[in-house]
């Protein structure tokens, strides 16, 4: 317990001493169709590795998902570490690409790896709104019927809001 507490102190000390390099926020996504109902919320923390227009960043989010599909029903928790590469920035807008992996924790079994495009708008010095649609990659979830997919999903856009320190 002491080691965990010390680790958390060091992590938060690093976060609060980093100037304009850390963001904190999250995103939400929902899918409603005839056969599928899904809702996910994903709190997130990230760190910019460079501060030039073409930036690299690393981050992770914890996804809480509740879904009802013909193959599966229930809730789960997933960890999504990713590296973000900002491709272009024009005034307050930027386009980025996340190279991500998503791993199931607890009841959510399986994993997925791939690319996720992001469009972000920096509303103020500290607040950024982001929009993401699509995922191109490999998806292996442990459904009853054993689904392996390589997909470009456009059904579940994600909307995020981030505070930049």
PLM region spans:
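Repeated loop/turn-to-beta-strand initiation elements of outer-membrane beta-barrel proteins
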Residues: 22-24, 52-56, 90-94, 125-129
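Structural signature of outer-membrane beta-barrel channels/translocons
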Residues: 46-50, 84-88, 104, 118-126, ...
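Helix-adjacent hinge/juxtasegments
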Residues: 65, 70-104
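Sec/Tat signal peptide C-region and signal peptidase I cleavage site
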Residues: 15-20
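Hydrophobic, lipid-facing positions within transmembrane beta-strands of outer-membrane proteins
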Residues: 39-43, 77-81, 111-117, 155-159
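Transmembrane beta-strands of outer-membrane beta-barrel pores
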Residues: 28-34, 49, 60-66, 87, ...
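Outer-membrane beta-barrel "beta-signal"
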Residues: 151-165
């Amino acid at each position: 317990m002491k080691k965990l507490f010390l680790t958390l102190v060091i992590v938060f000390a690093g976060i609060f001493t980093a100037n304009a390099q850390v963001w904190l926020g999250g995103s939400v996504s929902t899918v409603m169709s005839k056969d599928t109902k899904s809702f996910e919320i994903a709190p997130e923390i990230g760190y910019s590795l460079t501060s030039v227009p073409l930036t690299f960043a690393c981050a992770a989010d914890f996804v809480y998902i509740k879904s009802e599909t013909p193959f599966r029903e229930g809730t789960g928790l997933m960890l999504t570490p990713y590296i973000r590469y900002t491709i272009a920035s024009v005034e307050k807008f930027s386009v980025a690409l996340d190279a991500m992996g998503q791993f199931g924790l607890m009841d959510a079994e399986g994993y997925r790896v791939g690319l996720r495009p992001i469009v972000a708008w920096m509303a103020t010095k500290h607040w950024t709104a982001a929009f993401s649609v699509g995922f191109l990659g490999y998806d292996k979830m442990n459904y009853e019927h054993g689904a392996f997919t390589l997909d470009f999903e456009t059904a579940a856009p994600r909307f995020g809001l981030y505070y930049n320190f």
